[in-house]
């Protein structure tokens, strides 16, 4: 069961990824984790990646594909894997396909931009403990204060509305074209493509995903 998750930042992919991993016992493949592990292990690709990163440059698609290929060949991926956050672009998807990494299911979690902005820009964090609140969905007992310590809550830079909108712009420009790309692959019968309404409850989305994967 080789699964890829698609959706904008804040659409709830992380929550569903966790659910799929636990339900089906497949590992999540994150390119960030892979890079760190390869660098730590000192593999040839890891050393190459370290050189590039130490120079402050972006790791090339070829290098990332090489790491993904190495990773999916490991024993824990025998029953499948879950890709989240990769591929991000059509060239990456093409390179992945031509290197023989096939997918069975593409799952898109769809949430309108304004809902994502509401979700993410409403988050408030207690810096000392990492406790997370939300001005709409999970309010603190006293506005702007941590329930336990009474200290001030803060907005993470990542959750500032302008930052959220910037990330959404990048998603629409680079990653959203993959929706059409994998739609075309699915039309040829090479993969199943399913789109879920991410504004529903977490449990509802999980149930719908299970119905498709079973």
Swiss-Prot record:
Catalysis performed (reactions): AMP + ATP = 2 ADP
Residue ranges of the region described as NMP: 30-59
Residues the entry annotates as binding ATP: 10-15, 123, 132-133, 200
Entry EC no(s): 2.7.4.3
Localization (cell): Cytoplasm
Keyword Kinase among UniProt keywords: yes
Pathway involvement of the protein, from the record: Purine metabolism; AMP biosynthesis via salvage pathway; AMP from ADP: step 1/1
Single GO biological process annotation from the record: AMP salvage
Positions contributing to AMP binding: 31, 36, 57-59, 85-88, 92, 156, 167
Matching InterPro entries: Adenyl_kin_sub, Adenylat/UMP-CMP_kin, Adenylat_kinase_CS, Adenylate_kinase_lid-dom, P-loop_NTPase
UniProt region (LID), positions on chain: 122-159
Pfam families: ADK, ADK_lid
Function: Catalyzes the reversible transfer of the terminal phosphate group between ATP and AMP. Plays an important role in cellular energy homeostasis and in adenine nucleotide metabolism.
PANTHER family named in the record: NUCLEOTIDE KINASE (PTHR23359)
Entry similarity comment: Belongs to the adenylate kinase family.
Domain notes: Consists of three domains, a large central CORE domain and two small peripheral domains, NMPbind and LID, which undergo movements during catalysis. The LID domain closes over the site of phosphoryl transfer upon ATP binding. Assembling and dissambling the active center during each catalytic cycle provides an effective means to prevent ATP hydrolysis.
Entries under NCBIfam families matching the protein: adk (TIGR01351), PRK00279.1-1 (NF001379), PRK00279.1-2 (NF001380), PRK00279.1-3 (NF001381)
Subunit and partners: Monomer.
Protein name, per record: Adenylate kinase
Name of the gene this protein is made from: adk
């Amino acid at each position: 069961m080789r699964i890829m998750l698609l959706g904008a930042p804040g659409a709830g992919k992380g929550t569903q990824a966790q659910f799929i991993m636990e339900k089906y016992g497949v590992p999540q493949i994150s390119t960030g984790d892979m890079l760190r592990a390869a660098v730590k292990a000192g593999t040839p690709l890891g050393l190459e990646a370290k050189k590039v990163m130490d120079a402050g440059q972006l790791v090339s698609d070829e290098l990332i594909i090489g790491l993904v290929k190495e990773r999916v060949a490991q024993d824990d991926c025998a029953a499948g894997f879950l890709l989240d956050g990769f591929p991000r672009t059509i060239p990456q998807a093409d390179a992945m396909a031509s290197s023989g990494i096939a997918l069975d299911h593409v799952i898109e979690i769809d949430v309108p931009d304004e809902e994502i902005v509401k979700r993410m820009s409403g988050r408030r964090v207690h810096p000392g403990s990492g406790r997370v609140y939300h001005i709409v969905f999970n309010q603190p007992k006293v506005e702007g204060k941590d329930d336990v310590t009474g200290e001030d809550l803060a907005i993470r830079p990542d959750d500032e509305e302008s930052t959220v909108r910037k990330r959404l712009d990048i998603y629409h420009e680079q990653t959203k074209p993959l929706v059409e790309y994998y739609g075309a692959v699915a039309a040829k019968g090479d993969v199943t493509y399913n789109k879920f309404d991410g504004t529903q409850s977490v449990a509802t989305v999980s149930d719908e995903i299970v119905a498709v994967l079973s």
